[in-house]
């Protein structure tokens, strides 16, 4: 397994609701947050990488949509996820 696969499985294991859960909103948001965090570090050294910045904005938008869905579906799970990921200040 590559480092990315190992990190991905750790995130899935941490946020999964069940044994084989990979598609719940919590897992999807956690994976997107991990990728967003990595890309944010990338932009500190490569400020003019506009192509990747567009991908970052798509990921942020997708995460926002998933969070809005979860907030409407189950507010308690939404608040727990936000606190666990440390997204809202």
Swiss-Prot record:
The record's listing under Gene3D superfamilies reads: 6.10.250.3130, S15/NS1, RNA-binding
**Origin superkingdom:** Bacteria
Biological process terms from the Gene Ontology for this record are: translation
Does the entry feature the keyword Ribosomal protein, yes or no? yes
Annotated Gene Ontology cellular components are:
cytosolic small ribosomal subunit
| Database matches in InterPro entries | Ribosomal_uS15 (IPR000589), Ribosomal_uS15_bac-type (IPR005290), uS15_NS1_RNA-bd_sf (IPR009068)
Any Pfam family hit: Ribosomal_S15
Report the GO molecular function annotations: rRNA binding; structural constituent of ribosome
UniProt keyword list: Ribonucleoprotein, Ribosomal protein, RNA-binding, rRNA-binding
The family line of this record is:
Belongs to the universal ribosomal protein uS15 family.
Q: Which HAMAP family match?
A: Ribosomal_uS15_B (MF_01343_B)
- Alphabetical list of NCBIfam families matching this protein: S15_bact
**Quaternary organization:** Part of the 30S ribosomal subunit. Forms a bridge to the 50S subunit in the 70S ribosome, contacting the 23S rRNA.
Explain the purpose of this protein: One of the primary rRNA binding proteins, it binds directly to 16S rRNA where it helps nucleate assembly of the platform of the 30S subunit by binding and bridging several RNA helices of the 16S rRNA. Forms an intersubunit bridge (bridge B4) with the 23S rRNA of the 50S subunit in the ribosome.
Protein's UniProt name: Small ribosomal subunit protein uS15
Q: Which organism is it from?
A: Burkholderia mallei (strain ATCC 23344)
């Amino acid at each position: 397994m590559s480092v990315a696969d190992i990190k991905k499985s750790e995130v899935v294991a941490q946020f999964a609701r069940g044994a084989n859960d990979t598609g719940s909103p919590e897992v999807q948001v956690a994976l997107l947050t991990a990728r967003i965090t990595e890309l944010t570090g990338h932009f500190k050294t490569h400020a003019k990488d506009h192509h990747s910045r567009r991908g970052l904005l798509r990921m942020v938008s997708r995460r926002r949509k998933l969070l809005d869905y979860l907030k409407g579906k189950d507010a308690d799970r939404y608040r727990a996820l936000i606190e666990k990921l440390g997204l809202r200040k």
